[in-house]
Curated annotation (Swiss-Prot):
The modification N-acetylthreonine is found at residue 2. Residues 92-202 are annotated as: Required for interaction with U1 RNA. The gene is SNRNP70. One of its GO terms (biological process) is mRNA splicing, via spliceosome. This is U1 small nuclear ribonucleoprotein 70 kDa. CDD domains: RRM_snRNP70. The modification Phosphotyrosine is found at residue 126. InterPro entries: Nucleotide-bd_a/b_plait_sf (IPR012677), RBD_domain_sf (IPR035979), RRM_dom (IPR000504), snRNP70_RRM (IPR034143), U1_U11-U12_snRNP_70-35kDa (IPR051183), U1snRNP70_N (IPR022023). It comes from the Eukaryota. Keywords: Acetylation, Isopeptide bond, mRNA processing, Nucleus, Phosphoprotein, Ribonucleoprotein, RNA-binding, Ubl conjugation. The lineage of its organism: Eukaryota, Metazoa, Chordata, Craniata, Vertebrata. Component of the U1 snRNP. The U1 snRNP is composed of the U1 snRNA and the 7 core Sm proteins SNRPB, SNRPD1, SNRPD2, SNRPD3, SNRPE, SNRPF and SNRPG that assemble in a heptameric protein ring on the Sm site of the small nuclear RNA to form the core snRNP, and at least three U1 snRNP-specific proteins SNRNP70/U1-70K, SNRPA/U1-A and SNRPC/U1-C. Interacts with SCNM1. Found in a pre-mRNA splicing complex with SFRS4, SFRS5, SNRNP70, SNRPA1, SRRM1 and SRRM2. Found in a pre-mRNA exonic splicing enhancer (ESE) complex with SNRNP70, SNRPA1, SRRM1 and TRA2B/SFRS10.
């Protein structure tokens, strides 16, 4: 189809000129010719220097070694500072240390918010206080957490030393000790490597977790005797007594916890048993009411049949009233013979069957309501039916045995049967027929 295009369009489809060939700048890899083939390094070994003339290798420091070196240098530097400060430290020439050293009490671990008046109020119970000196930082002016209390009498200081240790002040338990800087020879404070604490001796395997006056291991490195050596046994006994007291408290708390758990489980079981007992009693009451209702229904139906039979047998008199369905026995028939449409006829049986079916399908609430209504009707009928019964008995005959049941209908007959039982029995009581007392 392109050959039919005009020349101006055919010019658009014309091919371009070929790319001009230029010779390569370098030879191709397969065209290169090496003067020498590949070889080993054996010819060049003689050019290497002798290993015996080489300088020894320099060993670099690892990270662990560098940290250990810095720690060691820090310890050495601190030891030099401690030695320098120890030469200048003299507690006897301290301007802040005034008063009698044997009447002065050292109080540590004090809350930073505790004031001097609070300390005085807490420690005046052991005796009159002469002076209280709280230590503050020289740089920031904040409290350091310890103080010195000077008593007027040495016996008061001994009493506070014995009883005030571990006392809680502002939420913190303080540590109480005597002033050892001026009383113990060669004593050094904590910042200069001394003190009673053992929490800065070294690593975790050397340090103790809790420092205090009751630590017996702190006396191992003490150069001089204690100013109160007879108090050591008392401190040991007090410490053991406190430990035993803490153990007894823990054991008592564990027993209380177990007792609470047992009481809680017992209450839960008792509550469950009571709930199950209530459910069982409800079920038993419901079954008992159902059985009683069935027995009363059966007894009532039996009494109805017997009354109908008795009324049909005595219907030979002229005063017999027609029943609700109008099926009274004929006057000229025999006294004990029932008519074709008597009380036991198919219509009466059908009505009894329908009535029993309807009553059996009633709920418990409807049955209770019917019984209450029947009881009320029976009560009203008993109040106003005395004269009527006497009139009927006075004008009775063969139909006097009917007692007006045929004219009352089904509801009236039911009420009457509940009040009078057949064959010399009274009305049923709790599902049982009661025999009438002989006259």
């Amino acid at each position: 189809m392109t050959q039919f295009l005009p020349p101006n369009l055919l010019a658009l489809f014309a091919p371009r000129d070929p790319i001009p060939y230029l010779p390569p700048l370098e030879k191709l890899p397969h065209e290169k010719h090496h003067n020498q083939p590949y070889c080993g390094i054996a010819p060049y070994i003689r050019e290497f220097e002798d290993p015996r003339d080489a300088p020894p290798p320099t060993r670099a420091e690892t990270r662990e070694e560098r940290m250990e070196r810095k720690r060691r240098e820090k310890i050495e530097r601190r030891q030099q500072e401690v030695e320098t400060e120890l030469k200048m430290w003299d507690p006897h020439n301290d301007p802040n240390a005034q008063g009698d050293a044997f009447k002065t009490l050292f109080v540590a671990r004090v809350n930073y918010d505790t004031t001097e008046s609070k300390l005085r109020r807490e420690f005046e119970v052991y005796g009159p206080i002469k002076r209280i000196h709280m230590v503050y930082s020289k740089r920031s002016g904040k409290p350091r957490g310890y103080a010195f209390i000077e008593y007027e009498h040495e016996r008061d200081m001994h009493s506070a030393y014995k009883h005030a240790d571990g006392k809680k002040i502002d939420g913190r338990r303080v540590l109480v000790d005597v002033e050892r800087g001026r009383t113990v020879k060669g004593w050094r404070p904590r910042r200069l490597g001394g003190g009673l604490g053992g929490t800065r001796r070294g690593g975790a395997d050397v340090n103790i977790r809790h420092s205090g006056r009751d630590d017996t291991s702190r006396y191992d490195e003490r150069p001089g005797p204690s100013p109160l050596p007879h108090r050591d046994r008392d401190r040991d006994r007090e410490r053991e007594r406190r430990e035993r007291s803490r153990e007894r408290d823990k054991e008592r708390e564990r027993r209380r916890s177990r007792s609470r758990d047992r009481r809680r489980r017992s209450r839960s079981r008792d509550k469950e048993e009571r709930r199950r007992s209530r459910e069982r009693s409800k079920d038993k009451d419901r079954d008992r009411k159902r059985r009683s209702s069935r027995s009363r229904e059966r007894a009532r139906r039996e009494r109805e049949r017997k009354e109908e039979l008795r009324g049909g047998g005595g219907g030979g008199g002229d005063m017999a009233e027609p029943s609700e369905a109008g099926d009274a026995p004929p006057d000229d028939g025999p006294p004990g013979e029932l008519g074709p449409d008597g009380p036991d006829g198919p219509e009466e049986k059908g009505r009894d069957r329908d009535r029993d079916r309807r009553r059996s399908h009633r709920s418990e609430r409807e049955r209770r309501r019917d019984r209450d209504r029947d009881r009320d009707r029976e009560h009203k009928r008993g109040e106003r039916g005395g004269d009527r019964g006497r009139d009927e008995a006075r004008g009775g005959g063969g139909g006097g045995q009917d007692n007006g049941l045929e004219g009352l209908g089904n509801d009236g007959r039911d009420m009457y049967m509940e009040s009078e039982g057949g064959d010399g029995y009274l009305a049923p009581e709790n599902g049982y027929l009661m025999e009438a007392a002989p006259e």
